[in-house]
């Protein structure tokens, strides 16, 4: 009788212990993965929730943007041609920081930016005279005529990126440009001779700021960049702005 009583008490104790165990929430966290086992009264069945928490991520990346410059606000005499005006942006290095568990990324980069604003072939070219960039005619009977304003400098893109889905992200932010070099070109043929004349120290603005937006789909991007600041300093050349449309990788 005593043995039966002891066996009954033992069985009751084991049952109570099992029920107590079912009300216990077990949390294991390994390598950024949290696994929660919950078998309490809220759910009569067995339930396992797996929550993936990405750790803080910092990546070093490189980017290239190639686009067409669309000039706006230029004086009527300056007829810039879109497909003679190009923009190449090479971000040599960019640090991209994603906070823990976030879908936003903050980036700062360092790179080079070359811009070219080419005129239509209407018989005039860009020249520098008396410390001012203006227009002058090409020599008579000149062929293969081309003239442009070009700048080259160091830029610092500061971008905020929002991941919209697994494959799509949107980026926006300012780009600070340090325009170290600038020149105007006149290229033409005359008889059997080819001429290429470059004039430097044209009075470009040393620092400008652009605003850029990017739509990226699986690493293939389309960007739009607006340049609200003038290319030349005041009274050093024609005043104009530009919008750039292109591809970004």
List the predicted regions and their residue ranges.
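Sec-dependent signal peptide cleavage junction
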Residues: 16-62
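Bacterial Sec-dependent N-terminal signal peptides
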Residues: 1-24, 161, 249
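Predominantly the C-terminal beta-signal and adjacent terminal strand-loop region
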Residues: 71, 197-249
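Residues on the lipid-exposed face of transmembrane beta-strands in outer-membrane beta-barrel proteins
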Residues: 64-68, 88-96, 110-114, 154-162, ...
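Outer-membrane beta-barrel proteins
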Residues: 39, 43-54, 92-99, 162-166, ...
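Outer-envelope beta-barrel architecture signal
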Residues: 56-64, 102-108, 150, 166-170, ...
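Glycine- and aromatic-enriched membrane insertion/assembly motifs of diderm outer-membrane
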Residues: 59-134
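Extracellular/periplasm-exposed beta-strand and loop segments of Gram-negative cell-envelope proteins
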Residues: 71-83, 117-150, 179-212
């Amino acid at each position: 009788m005593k043995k039966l009583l002891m066996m009954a008490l033992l069985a009751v104790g084991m049952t109570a212990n099992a029920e107590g165990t079912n009300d216990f929430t077990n949390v294991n966290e390994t390598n950024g993965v949290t696994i929660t086992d919950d078998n309490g009264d809220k759910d009569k069945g067995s339930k396992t929730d797996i929550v993936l928490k990405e750790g803080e991520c910092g990546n070093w990346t490189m980017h290239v943007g190639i686009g067409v410059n669309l000039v706006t606000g230029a004086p009527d005499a300056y007829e810039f041609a879109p497909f003679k005006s190009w923009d190449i942006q090479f971000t040599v290095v960019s640090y991209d920081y994603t906070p823990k568990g976030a879908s936003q990324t903050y980036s700062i980069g360092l790179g080079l930016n070359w811009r070219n604003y080419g005129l239509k072939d209407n018989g005039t070219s860009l020249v520098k005279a008396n410390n001012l960039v203006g227009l002058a005619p090409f020599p008579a009977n000149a062929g293969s005529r081309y003239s442009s304003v070009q700048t080259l400098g160091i830029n610092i893109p500061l971008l905020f990126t929002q991941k919209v889905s697994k494959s799509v992200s949107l980026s926006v932010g300012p780009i600070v440009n340090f325009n170290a070099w600038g020149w105007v070109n006149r290229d033409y043929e005359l008889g059997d001779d080819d001429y290429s004349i470059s004039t430097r120290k044209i009075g470009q603005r040393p620092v400008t700021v652009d605003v850029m937006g990017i739509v990226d789909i699986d690493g293939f991007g389309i960007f739009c960049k607006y340049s609200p600041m003038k290319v030349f300093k005041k009274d050093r050349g024609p005043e104009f702005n530009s919008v750039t449309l292109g591809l970004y990788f």
